[in-house]
Amino acid sequence: MSIDFQQLPHAGIRSLIPYVPGKSIEELAKEKGITDIIKLASNENPLGCSPLALSAIQTMSSHYIATYPSPWNHPLMSKLASYLKVKPEQLFLSNGSDYLFNILLNCFALHTDRHILTHDYAFSTYAIQANSLQIPINSVPIGHNWEVNITDIVNACNQQTGIIFIANPNNPTGMLIQQEEIKYLLEQIPKSTLLVLDEAYYEFAASQLTVNSLDWLEEHPNLVVTRTFSKIYGMAGLRLGYAIANPSIINILKRVQLPFIVNQVALAAAYAAIDDDDFIQSSLKMNNEGMSQLQAGFNELNIKYLHSSCNFLTFDCEEDSIALYNYLLDNGIIVRPLHAYKMNNFIRVTIGTKEQNSRFLTALKNFYL
């Protein structure tokens, strides 16, 4: 008897549209037979990783690699806590931010009568993970200016709202919600509702913020802030994210975590990277200059784009973006079309080096002119 394994999972899995990452350089090289490729699709740091992190990796002993990691006893815990001005018991280390979202859903929404709340054009993994667990998710529409109306979030929240997911700044729009609005949201929602503030791009937006969200943790124990070493630190390949929250929340997460969720290499690299302020400042300088370079290029071509507080720009092709996307691929440039977000006319491009940005803008001009 033939078994249709597609029908064995629950309905949430069967109907799931999986997250598809940006095309890799290796994938495009295989498809097109070209070697001169730049990737501006996944908001990675074009400068690579911190030299201090790389040195820490290169000098690791084989014994360190051969032993199981112990994240909670690693010196990174106290060092990161000191850097963030929080207590070690407020930290939870994770194999990337995605695992954080999954474990939060499992702990605070799964097998309850509670739902998840976010907004349209939020980071897609929130809905993907909620749907995979068959947790109802409600999405609040945003305005024509692509900005989130916090009052609408407040009005949509009730006692059955288990978790609110907000990325600030948001991917893929790049929009930043001012801290006064986030504080207002915290003051209005039920104390039993977690606000998960996804700050993956925090370092790129920090200069625009008047308050650090971590300052609210004591007053609002239902706040969970997530950050990552993937973006500004250039460590996306090592998968290290972390949550900062009330110790009681952290304790619950530790009860259900998978064993050895953070590897030894990531721990050593992050421990070193925290000290590399020169690399952080160089990355921010390059990003600011690259942002201005791309904006000037878009303005010259009369291309509309969304204001961004991240390390990428999302722009409007004014028609389905697939033609431009394929043209850029043919020219060895990988960007990110946003059909998965139902933004069919939009493309997201990572801010690259000056040379990478110039190559992208030249290809853009050749396509449109």
Swiss-Prot record:
Which catalytic reaction applies to this protein? L-histidinol phosphate + 2-oxoglutarate = 3-(imidazol-4-yl)-2-oxopropyl phosphate + L-glutamate
Its top-level enzyme class, in one word, is transferase
Report the record's Gene Ontology biological process terms: L-histidine biosynthetic process
Q: Which InterPro entries does its entry note? A: Aminotransferase_I/II_large (IPR004839), HisP_aminotrans (IPR005861), HistidinolP_aminotransfase (IPR050106), PyrdxlP-dep_Trfase (IPR015424), PyrdxlP-dep_Trfase_major (IPR015421), PyrdxlP-dep_Trfase_small (IPR015422)
N6-(pyridoxal phosphate)lysine carried by residues: 231
Q: Which cofactor does it need?
A: pyridoxal 5'-phosphate
Q: Its Gene Ontology molecular function terms?
A: histidinol-phosphate transaminase activity; pyridoxal phosphate binding
Identify the CDD domains for this entry: AAT_like
- What EC number(s) does its UniProt record assign? 2.6.1.9
Pfam families tied to this protein: Aminotran_1_2 (PF00155)
What keywords is this UniProt entry annotated with?
Amino-acid biosynthesis, Aminotransferase, Histidine biosynthesis, Pyridoxal phosphate, Transferase
The answer on whether this UniProt entry bears the keyword Metal-binding reads: no
So, what pathway does this thing act in? Amino-acid biosynthesis; L-histidine biosynthesis; L-histidine from 5-phospho-alpha-D-ribose 1-diphosphate: step 7/9
> Known NCBIfam families for this protein?
hisC
Q: Which HAMAP family match?
A: HisC_aminotrans_2
Quaternary structure and partners: Homodimer.
Record-stated family: Belongs to the class-II pyridoxal-phosphate-dependent aminotransferase family. Histidinol-phosphate aminotransferase subfamily.
**What protein name does the entry list?**
Histidinol-phosphate aminotransferase 2
Q: Name the species this protein comes from.
A: Legionella pneumophila (strain Paris)
- Taxon lineage: Bacteria, Pseudomonadati, Pseudomonadota, Gammaproteobacteria, Legionellales
